[in-house]
Curated annotation (Swiss-Prot):
Similarity field: Belongs to the Syd family.
Physiological role: Interacts with the SecY protein in vivo. May bind preferentially to an uncomplexed state of SecY, thus functioning either as a chelating agent for excess SecY in the cell or as a regulatory factor that negatively controls the translocase function.
Lineage: Bacteria, Pseudomonadati, Pseudomonadota, Gammaproteobacteria, Alteromonadales
Compartments where found: Cell inner membrane
Pfam annotation, one family: Syd
Topology with respect to the bilayer: Peripheral membrane protein
Origin superkingdom: Bacteria
The protein, known as: Protein Syd
GO cellular component, one term: cytoplasmic side of plasma membrane
Keywords carried by this UniProt record: Cell inner membrane, Cell membrane, Membrane
Matching InterPro entries: Syd (IPR009948), Syd_sf (IPR038228)
Length: 186
């Protein structure tokens, strides 16, 4: 039986929660009163500029990216919609057999809107360059390289921004999420 993106993402977030118990710095963020999020710990009294605990939070409503899909006249791969609309979360540093990366997530509604705008820009660039449409999901340690999902096949690809995807990293997003482990930024 194949794993769904939601289940694989839930499992990864569970691994992240366990990791934070051993590496508290991975679950701490500088509090910004102008950048609200349900991810901030609720058992502390935050002050701007201080480091406080945070954790990924399941979203109450998911998004199917309907407006984005209509604007681009494109059906967004359902794995990507699940990936980006399941949790509110800061980006999470992780290790994959192919290297270190940073999983991209949305911190709040404003961040989610910005994410969608960036996806639109990325897809329009891919169209202008007459390349397969991809949607980025992670940053890598290599400059100008991202991990993206091929919108047709659902495969996770390594691609240099502006160029064709370089290589397949995982056959699908659920498998990719099963293959990564949280790590520290060092």
């Amino acid at each position: 039986m194949t794993s769904t993106v939601n289940q694989s993402l839930d499992d990864f977030m569970g691994r992240f929660a366990a990791f934070v118990k051993e590496h508290a710095e991975a679950g701490a963020i500088e509090y910004d009163e102008d950048w609200p999020s349900p991810c901030y710990a609720t058992d502390v009294t935050p002050e701007s500029g201080t480091s406080i605990p945070w954790k990924p939070v399941l979203r109450e409503q998911t998004s199917e990216f309907k407006d984005l899909s209509e604007a681009l006249e494109l059906t967004l791969h359902p794995d990507v919609a699940q990936f980006y609309s399941r949790y509110w979360s800061d980006n999470i540093v992780a290790q994959h057999p192919s290297g270190k990366l940073q999983i991209l997530q949305a911190w709040n509604e404003e961040d989610f809107e910005r994410l969608q705008q960036n996806i639109v820009g990325h897809i329009l660039m891919k169209r202008r360059l007459r390349q397969p449409e991809t949607i980025f999901i992670a940053l890598t340690d290599e400059d100008d390289f991202v991990l993206s999902v091929d919108n047709q096949t659902g495969a996770v690809m390594l691609e240099q921004v502006g160029l064709q995807p370089k290589e397949q990293i995982s056959p699908d997003l659920a498998t990719f999420l099963d293959e990564i482990e949280p790590t520290t930024t060092d």
